[in-house]
């Protein structure tokens, strides 16, 4: 099948890369976002020719900071023209047939005398099936079968690990590492001591000098297992260091192949910054290559066929949802707010990359709406708004009434009204799912968020650089993790009673860690550009202030060490045994955190969305996989 030709909207001409409208008129704002409930004439804020690289004087004489962000990459006309032949009506019957066939495979490897089962490798077969359906993004169809398989494997688990088959006395590294990872992620209690027996007399993981494919696969599974370590697990830290070095060396010696591509992907996108849909697309491509080389077994061929069908059916749904998102964005008047980053397509890519359940369209679309407003507020508080205007807006949000717009400057009125309407609309949606009013949760999160941003705006206006601790405490909130997570997860078809919500929302340890990691990671990617715009305070500058004589490299090393430590703590908060709060409830918030981290892999992938992020949009949303 031919590949879609992707034609992003070309960058618009601009004056010193300032906030220029699509008609090339130097206007920061042509009209407010919304006129709902208001009768007013829009008043534009026009940039004069008096500009520097980071400031501009508007025609009302106000000196404003600017972000110099590139324009929207995805034209609405292009989005509305998307089409796919892979809708459920065309491919749903084929998918159901394949689902039934894969369930039969699960059943046959679970039979004592089944044709696909052998006492020599039955445990590895169960683990491989579970791992494959999860990496291929089709596990939602097989939750019962997965539970049966993992219960079976766990019944043979021992303090010395397991071998590939229940009759194999000696444990092997590959099966033990894969089993450790899969079992821990599903809430089974496993301890890392199982890896001690694989060490040599020098305390290192024992392996031969010959890098066979089997040995490399074993070390790859060890690396994947090491990424879900808890803070106190020294052996897992050692395993990560060893396996990372081993795999990097292997990439230099083995030929380019599906195995080398799998290794490169896993090293590049560690579990905490991986998007499940990108992993699915990558793994499909890897298995397709193996299928071409005729190295796939019958079971995996069937899984691959189902994965391709499911990927493309969801791709059809993605394009329909993206049309709704783009239409909403266009009709809201947001394109006229030319001082903000327009990243609605990128936000949709994030959320559809972490949740591929077809029935959750409402969740995905409303997640984009929340993130869109987070971006508007971010750019307004970070750059465009004056400190007096921002204080007025913060007070208006606390008041939470349409009449609060009376005191706002004209360009803020539309922002406020649309924010007010959207948050209330989302609260009504959440009420349907949760059976109770959740507006107060949303308002509290929003007020805290704007309060943290106002504090940062005050730091900018006075040139104040806080202590590292003061900055990070505020940054956990201004990272927007809480506001981007709270309302969307309440619209899922998952109950979040108060006792569950308090384990993932503020002031829980889970929320604290997620916000901290996002702030720390974001600053390491953004501090140089932020500093060029006049934002001196960052984790890096605050650390250097607290530690006279330290360099930027010292600060980055310290912060990266903090991130690694906090990732392990977040692992524990997600996976720790808790009868009252199931892993499945926390996983939704955790996956949003993974998605947000993904966009800071190389740089600030939201602000600079015309490189890796653009490719991600194409690969996971716009293009189907070849059938």
Swiss-Prot record:
Mg(2+) 3 binds at residue 530. Mg(2+) 1 binds at residues 378, 382. InterPro entries: Isoprenoid_synthase_dom_sf, Terpene_cyclase-like_1_C, Terpene_cyclase_plant_C1, Terpene_synth_N, Terpene_synth_N_sf, Terpene_synthase-like, Terpene_synthase_metal-bd, Terpenoid_cyclase/PrenylTrfase. Residues 1-36 form a transit peptide. Signal peptide: none annotated. A motif (DDXXD motif) lies at residues 378-382. Binds 3 Mg(2+) or Mn(2+) ions per subunit. It is found in: Plastid, Chloroplast. Mg(2+) 2 binds at residues 378, 382. GO terms for molecular function: lyase activity; magnesium ion binding; terpene synthase activity. It catalyses: (2E)-geranyl diphosphate = (+)-car-3-ene + diphosphate. Keywords: Chloroplast, Lyase, Magnesium, Manganese, Metal-binding, Plastid, Transit peptide. It comes from the Eukaryota. It is an enzyme of class 4 (lyase). Terpene synthase (TPS) involved in defensive oleoresin formation in conifers in response to insect attack or other injury. Belongs to the terpene synthase family. Tpsd subfamily. This is Carene synthase, chloroplastic. It comes from Picea glauca. The gene is 3CAR.
